[in-house]
Amino acid sequence: MTTREVIIPKGMENIYDTYHYAPAIRVGDTLYLSGQVGRDENLNVVEGTEAQFVQAFENVRKVLGAAGATFDDVVELETWFTDDMNALKTFLDVKDRYFTNRYPTWTGFAVKGFSMPGILVEIKCKAVLGLSDT
């Protein structure tokens, strides 16, 4: 029987308890991450475009790490951006700091906004643990 394990990194317990939001769920070797945004542990939106992108990726790293995964295990990436697509170049520069070896599939969307004012991007991904290159 395949098991379902909720992944809650240290510092994200409150969001799980309050909003019933699982940062990730592991089923077998597959890890499904919920969308991560540029908020700190106190749920404050990080100021500055690049800083917010970095924080969103650091939140992804934190969730991956809690499950024993890294960015090399990510096979699918989905990103949602606010209408200001002028920040795409900055996002690409930041993304390439995290994905340096194995590149995932990637789909990007433009949206009007997010549930919290000031959020510029949301990053969701899927990882498979124990992958090897062929």
Positions of PLM-derived features:
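N-terminal presequence-like segments and the immediate start of the first folded domain
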Residues: M1-E58, K62-V75, F81-T134
